[in-house]
Amino acid sequence: MGRYRVMIVEDDPIVAEDIRIKLGRMGYEVVALAATGRQAVSKAREHRPDIVLMDIRLGAEMTGIEAAAELKENYQIPVIFLTAYTDEDTLAKAKLTEPYGYLVKPFNDRELKSCLEIALYRQASDRKISENRQWLETTLNSIGDAVIATDENGRVSFMNPVAEMLTGWKEADAAGKRIQAVFHI
């Protein structure tokens, strides 16, 4: 395992320190501790952690869920939520940020390590998929022939510039339309 950089966002300093010690023993580098959502965003911008362990309830100024949404949108940093709350409303709000994990307090070392390993593996997989998608799109856009891709239902999901010229449709306008509506043989 490489030395992954972790940021802990926890408003209880004793809990934060306990997690920091556990992570150090597991071989992770804790690059920052934050006690509020605003601090989390600021320190993430400064330290660029590989992953963030985020308490959901951080106070009224900015919740952990709001901070996680900002980290995802602006920095693409994955978040694992740490919480003592498992009610439906909290879980529904947390899911909107597409977290990489959800640990219910109190948790043991094995649960923490497993959740981190799975989240970091998923992050690496997501990054690879994104790189492959970008490479494929660049390749298809540079082909001199018209290329139109559809999903399993025959709806347009991609058109290169040559296909746009051939059909008279812009990719953004054709996306989601049935191929028969866009291209007539």
Tell me the role of every PLM-derived stretch.
Residues 4, 12-32:
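Two-component/phosphorelay signaling modules centered on CheY-like receiver
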Residues 17-18, 131-154, 161-165:
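PAS/LOV and related PAS-like sensory modules
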Residues 36-39, 60-66:
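Acidic catalytic/metal-coordinating carboxylates
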Residues 163-174:
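PAS/PAS-like sensory domain cap-loop motif
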Residues 173-185:
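PAS-family sensory/regulatory domains
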